[in-house]
Curated annotation (Swiss-Prot):
GO MF term set: ATP binding; ATP hydrolysis activity; identical protein binding; lipid binding; protein-containing complex binding
Regulation: ATPase activity is inhibited or reduced by lowering pH from 9.0 to 7.0, and by addition of Ca(2+), EDTA, KNO(3) or by treatment with N-ethylmaleimide (NEM).
Subcellular location field: Cytoplasm, Cytosol; Endoplasmic reticulum; Nucleus; Cytoplasm, Stress granule
Function comment: Necessary for the fragmentation of Golgi stacks during mitosis and for their reassembly after mitosis. Involved in the formation of the nuclear envelope, and of the transitional endoplasmic reticulum (tER). The transfer of membranes from the endoplasmic reticulum to the Golgi apparatus occurs via 50-70 nm transition vesicles which derive from part-rough, part-smooth transitional elements of the endoplasmic reticulum (tER). Vesicle budding from the tER is an ATP-dependent process.
GO CC, one annotated term: cytosol
Source organism: Xenopus tropicalis (Western clawed frog)
Region (Disordered): 768-805
The protein, known as: Transitional endoplasmic reticulum ATPase
Superkingdom: Eukaryota
Gene name of this polypeptide: vcp
Residues annotated to bind ATP 2: G521, C522, G523, K524, T525, L526
Pfam families: AAA, AAA_lid_3, CDC48_2, CDC48_N
Post-translational modification, as annotated: Phosphorylated.
Amino acid sequence: MASGSDSKSDDLSTAILKQKSRPNRLIVDESINEDNSVVSLSQAKMDELQLFRGDTVLLKGKKRREAVCIVLSDDTCSDEKIRMNRVVRNNLRVRLGDVISIQPCPDVKYGKRIHVLPIDDTVEGITGNLFEVYLKPYFLEAYRPIRKGDIFLVRGGMRAVEFKVVETDPSPYCIVAPDTVIHCEGEPIKREDEEESLNEVGYDDIGGCRKQLAQIKEMVELPLRHPALFKAIGVKPPRGILLYGPPGTGKTLIARAVANETGAFFFLINGPEIMSKLAGESESNLRKAFEEAEKNAPAIIFIDELDAIAPKREKTHGEVERRIVSQLLTLMDGLKQRAHVIVMAATNRPNSIDPALRRFGRFDREVDIGIPDSTGRLEILQIHTKNMKLSDDVDLEQVANETHGHVGADLAALCSEAALQAIRKKMDLIDLEDETIDAEVMNSLAVTMDDFRWALSQSNPSALRETVVEVPQVTWEDIGGLEDVKRELQELVQYPVEHPDKFLKFGMTPSKGVLFYGPPGCGKTLLAKAIANECQANFISIKGPELLTMWFGESEANVREIFDKARQAAPCVLFFDELDSIAKARGGNIGDGGGAADRVINQILTEMDGMSTKKNVFIIGATNRPDIIDPAILRPGRLDQLIYIPLPDEKSRIAILKANLRKSPVAKDVDLDFLAKMTNGFSGADLTEICQRACKLAIRESIENEIRRERERQTNPSAMEVEEDDPVPEIRRDHFEEAMRFARRSVSDNDIRKYEMFAQTLQQSRGFGSFRFPAGGQGGAGPSQGAGGGSGGSHFNEEEDDLYG
């Protein structure tokens, strides 16, 4: 039931986005007729809308664009479609498959005069009279309806020329009759100015924030378009919206789109531009902006970077800043009732804004525009790639799933990086000196999935730019042994990211943290690196000592900041290496700057508990001194899984040696099994050192051989004609034997005993290894309780022994 009510409320919150289906809403289709003034409908649709052949109709497209056309019937057109050619589609700013509305427009006047200008790049090199060759035949006897701002294409004299309607009398639309005067004097219009208006942002250029967009539409469009609704119900329409969220999520873009789509007057105030050195001028700048907007109502005032002009008054030292905040407050209250002025503001630091601004009646709605989820990312990628040439193998869904924590700006950068990579591949065919590039090269360009993969490897989300996250190139194969630990880790990090539905089904939140402990050199850090690489989560590595600074309160702020970043870029793995340096048992350390270390631990503890459950943030700690770590951090709910990573046994040692020598040429007679048998008590790092030394010896021998041969060649050039084989093709037994002479154990038996003891105490404190439910129905227990007993319990116990022994 809950899910049903959820979806219902979800429907209500985005109700404004739904397209209402009315008979005059039609889907745009490609036209067969090349005429610029004609659209065609099916006969049935024309009867339904009571239109006759040759009627003038008004079409409404995107971004408040309209066009006037003549309607004809076309029997091949299906009922819900409307056919129009490219020129009309451009004027309406629509694509094939978009929805437009059509309405009869019976009383279009005949024009007295119209003014049209050609667009410069289509008339280059044309001599002669434009009017005679192009315009006269186009308009002659045609009675074409035109609208101010339209662009139309005229073919004639071997080429096509585009004209723009600059002015019509009567405005805004009229029919060009035989006695209409057509002016075409003046400078041709530059294509760039035209393109700019074409590239205006609309609602369809915004992806990944559907709910927020619905909120903003009902806050902005309803009061501007239908103020009567609010009058009827008897409330004041809202007047301020504060958009906040991390940089790059599209706050300014949304404001632009709203302005374009509502057609309201748009007044942009950049925070810092208002400031002036003269007393009182900054405030009057603000007042002017608001007056200007009120004159041009309905209007939207958009204040970008609000935190620059309205910081908290008690924190600011300058008198001017305080006065500006006060001025803004009085202006927002003093907006006359229903003056149809809406104030929107954007900031990425909502908490540094003066609280008086955030009350109802000023900025009444705060819309959090957060980091998009994978469906949102897919929308954004589709928007950015709709004009790109993609090859067939590009799977945008996969790209969307792999870009955790990316905001819209990062995805745009990702697309352009992939496109650049596609161009780089063709660089050998492109010469920078040439004037033009071959059409063949141009047509063969397409962005492939490999380009996207390359771009993915280059890009990291902007939320994590400061704590630069190098995802390490370590895979599970690089880690020898430790199979159980690997499985445990995969379950911890990958399951919540990949199978969240299972956790919902069983009604549990996934566990948040793991602590690896064990002797140095056993691969604790390596494991954390591998998990960061294998599951597609972001990875932040925190070196303990970096958090502490000399300033009071700064160390704790660092901790808070890191956790905030991780939450923004969820799913994210936070890796604390050398946890013992920042999470020592509290109260014991005398003489450290005012107990800074204690405060850092307190901060970490509260952060781990206060982690909002929605975000997938995992904490992995690694330490080789588990005995001095504060016990509060080891309780379930914080770092609940304590995993002992022991010295490798013989099987693991073979695996480690093999993993180390995966890429090296090793002679057939080197017996790694024997080597593993002999190196009892060696840690993984020690084994790696043996392999490295053997490699080094082989390299040394190889270089000495080359030098010797070079000398011989110089003394006796004729004898050395025959090219010899490589004298040292692989790492031989004697290299390993030599290396073993220097091998040493880094962990003494004494240390091992300490770890075993610690693991043992943990084991004993559990003490429920042989726990069983009673078999019968004792104490009123039903049969359902007994069902869980038996093999399950003993199996559980073996697992535990395996991992922690």
